[in-house]
Amino acid sequence: IVYGSADGFLYAWKPDGTNVPGFPVNLGAPILGSIAVGRLDGPAVQLSIVVPVADGSIHVRLANGSGRPGFPVSLPPAGIGQGFSPALADMNGDGFTDIVVASGNGRVYVFDRSGAQVAPWTVSSRFSSLTSDATLASPVVADINGDGVNDVVVGDENGSLAALSGASGAMLPGFPIAMAAEATGTPALCDCDGDGMTEIVTVDFGGTLHVWDYDLPFSPAGPAPWPQFH
């Protein structure tokens, strides 16, 4: 069990309740978002623990508690963020897993396994007109426009649902979709009705459940690595 706490410590326990060697680890600021665990270096390599911290930094720890080279990284501009929950997906087609974060400044940032930013998720990747407190939701990742590149879907506090192209970082046609209340829930991507096409599902702050048909095939066996909250 791996757990991030508001006391700034990252904990890891064995099934018998004892600490995993190397844990807990003090990351220096509260851990308010959900952590993500995945194999950044490929399927045969040890797990990495990706931790969003309230000072706007993203830490990556290995299974023994040691830090991964190149991390922590800060969401630009430095300090923006309250520990937004990351998604893990290959965003540039190099066969390795990247870290996807929707920041409070209204932009999506992607970092590779070395901590470097992944283009085009640097300048053109705005999902919201808000420049602070833009979202409490986590991004989800799948190829929803059929071009073979993973796209990012995320909601914002203005009540809109954005979908950004993995090829360009720009808003996909037909988005953003307006809702009557803040899009605080993390969306999910699925074939909900069995028609072979993609549906986008989310809940707004007013408690309304939204489901949209998206007229392209849903292919979970393909590049749909993070289609819902983990």
For the regions a language model picked out, list residue spans one by one.
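Extracytoplasmic/lumenal domain signature
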Residues: 1-230
